[in-house]
Amino acid sequence: MQSYHTVIGIFALGNSVLNLTVRDDDIGWTVDAIKRNMALKTEETFCEQIISGTDGKRVKTKISRAIETEAEHFTRATEYANKMYPLLLKNIEEAISEIYLKDLGYHRNTKYPKQEKINELIAMAEEYAEKSINNKNNEKAPNWEEEAQSNLFKRKRAAELAKLLETKCIFNEIKGSTNLERLNQLLATETGRKAIHTALIANRKRKIGSNMMDIIVCGSIPPYNELLGGKLISILSCSPTVISDYTHRYENQVSEIASRMKGQRVIRDSKLVYLGTTSLYAVGSSQYNRIKVPLSENSNLEFRKIGITEGFGTVFFSKETTSLFSKLLELQDGGKKINHVFGEGT
């Protein structure tokens, strides 16, 4: 930075929240999003109607009407299913390929996994969950294969593989002759919807830690706040320079958890493709609202509100109370289960 260089405002890129329903729904990473894309498109309007026998009392009524023909709906849904169904299958196979399997007794190319094997993996995960105490990180020069075989990651690998194989079995049982029929069959049952959810999450896990970030803007410093400096900082956070710097900063970054799950070094794709943000208040954001920058004849860079998040309250415990809870859990579990080790929290 230059000496006496003007500082208009401060911003940073932070890790995206893992579970954010309104964002995932907007991207298409939820079962509800798939159901909407498969459904007939409708338009809802509201009007007031007089209720008979009430001396002119009016009630607000919702009217729904189709905005596409049955033929248009069939064509659109078919195209969507032909794209989505193979993608769901691909997500499952790619997730399985990222798990170290040598000590799990599973062959990677098994097309039709058996329920007996899934039950074995579930039992293995439960067994190693009991052994996952006093975990330690080898942060200096980790041997990824040895790390994968640790009690903590053997438990994680067995549990993840069991879930993925169970999902694969559900997809194998679908008998439809077209992708449209197969996807509709999955959406029709709770088991099928659960399988879709697992396949979507498998994709989200790979994207959320590397291709997506949250914008954190602290606002502008006087006198630039009077010149809407905060909005300028928000716009510049999406600039080619920021995206390029992010890509180069993380292009050789080793994914700690993914490497331990696979038993070898994993470097995720670092191309930044999604920037989002959340706000403390739901009423609006003076920092981001009304931002719109023309890019070309048919496109704009603009802030788009996609929904309202749901949050939970927080509680505060004193250091003394926290220490006593920690000692109590150690006595109960026979050791420390939370040791600030990669993988314990996810």
Task: State each model region's role.
Residues 1-346:
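Extended, composition-driven regions rather than compact fold-specific motifs
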